[in-house]
């Protein structure tokens, strides 16, 4: 016959085991959802670091895991191979090209505009080179931000200013080399991006000739919005974990709201991106807008930009950009 002492001991052990299993179940139920985010660490990645470091992902039970990637092709490749669920800052041309090859792969929850107010792409000229406008670059040796899209845009802007191929030399150059190339005088001018422009001007090695080039020369107005990049979720993420995707978008929207009204967000650039501390307080930022807040006019300008790219031969066929804007 089992003694009272043994019965009590066995009961206690059983209750302990049940309690442990219950706690494990609770912990599992409350575990944050992991979301892998591909991040190209430049200024346009700012919303990710604001949402992460201000606890906005944590507030919606998301464990955001950064996958550092350099450039659009790397981000798209990681989306295809399911190594990331989200691309924090993917060029829209790259996104639409990916959707032509694999429809529904890239879905933007927010997009970023740039123009003369929200500066990004800029033609610069080195110190000592005689040019006061883009039209003065005939005979110049010009560097460009890398990739087919940037080369196409540089040529389009030069053509709009009366310069045809053969009137200049154009070489694509990795972005980290732009500032030193201007300092060394390796190139006379450049189609470059922020924060390189601000760095060059602060150093005195180059000056800006004109910024907001896509808005002016592609969309036809200085104050137009060129929707050139944005934050995209994979179609599989949206299909398989719609609630997590919705919570991610909510955290992202909070970060965008902070960027619009709180200049202290710039502190997140210094330790997380290629932006040096000296220029973080003044470097221009693009205009971050959630897809749900886009007006009909915004969508029309977005379509106009992508149509221009298609007509230029970079995309193989027309794309309806609204198909790949995701709202919740």
Kindly give the residue locations of the regions a language model identified.
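Bacterial N-terminal signal peptides that target proteins for export
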Residues: 2-15
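C-terminal segment of classical bacterial N-terminal signal peptides
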Residues: 21-29
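Short, glycine-/small- and polar/acidic-enriched structural segments
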Residues: 33-161, 169-172, 188-194
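Small-molecule pocket liners
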Residues: 46, 106, 114-123, 206-207, ...
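Short, solvent-exposed loop/beta-turn-alpha elements that line the ligand-binding surface or hinge
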Residues: 59, 115-116, 214-224, 288-299
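Pocket-lining segment of extracytoplasmic ligand-binding domains
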Residues: 91-93, 102, 177-270
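Secondary-structure end/capping motifs
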Residues: 238-314
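C-terminal solvent-exposed extensions
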Residues: 306-328
């Amino acid at each position: 016959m089992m003694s009272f002492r043994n019965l009590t001991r066995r009961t206690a052990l059983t209750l302990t085991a049940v309690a442990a299993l219950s706690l494990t179940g609770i912990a599992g139920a409350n575990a944050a959802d992991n979301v892998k985010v591909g991040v190209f660490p430049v200024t346009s990645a700012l919303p990710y670091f604001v949402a992460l470091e201000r606890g906005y992902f944590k507030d919606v039970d998301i464990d955001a895991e950064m996958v550092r990637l350099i450039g659009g092709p790397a981000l798209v490749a990681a989306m295809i191979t399911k190594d990331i669920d989200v691309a924090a800052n993917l060029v829209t041309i790259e996104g639409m090209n990916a959707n032509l090859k694999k429809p529904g792969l890239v879905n933007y929850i927010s997009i970023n505009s740039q123009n003369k107010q929200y500066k990004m792409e800029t033609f610069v000229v080195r110190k000592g080179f005689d040019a006061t406008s883009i039209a003065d670059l005939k005979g110049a040796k010009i560097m460009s931000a890398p990739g087919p899209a940037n080369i196409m845009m540089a040529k389009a802007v030069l053509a709009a200013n009366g310069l045809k191929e053969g009137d200049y030399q154009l070489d694509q150059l990795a972005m980290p080399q732009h500032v030193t190339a201007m300092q060394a005088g390796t190139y006379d001018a450049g189609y470059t991006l922020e924060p390189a422009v601000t760095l060059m001007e602060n150093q005195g090695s180059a000056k800006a000739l004109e910024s907001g080039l896509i808005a002016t020369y592609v969309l036809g107005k200085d104050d137009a919005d060129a929707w050139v990049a944005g934050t995209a979720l994979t179609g599989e993420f949206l299909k398989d974990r719609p609630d997590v995707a919705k919570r991610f978008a909510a955290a992202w929207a909070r970060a965008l709201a902070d960027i619009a009204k709180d200049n202290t967000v710039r502190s997140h650039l210094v330790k997380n991106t290629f932006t040096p501390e000296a220029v973080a307080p003044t470097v221009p930022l693009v205009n971050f807008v959630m897809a749900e807040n886009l007006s009909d006019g915004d969508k029309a300008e977005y379509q106009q930009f992508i149509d221009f790219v298609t007509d230029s031969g970079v995309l193989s066929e027309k794309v309806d950009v609204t198909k790949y804007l995701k709202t919740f």
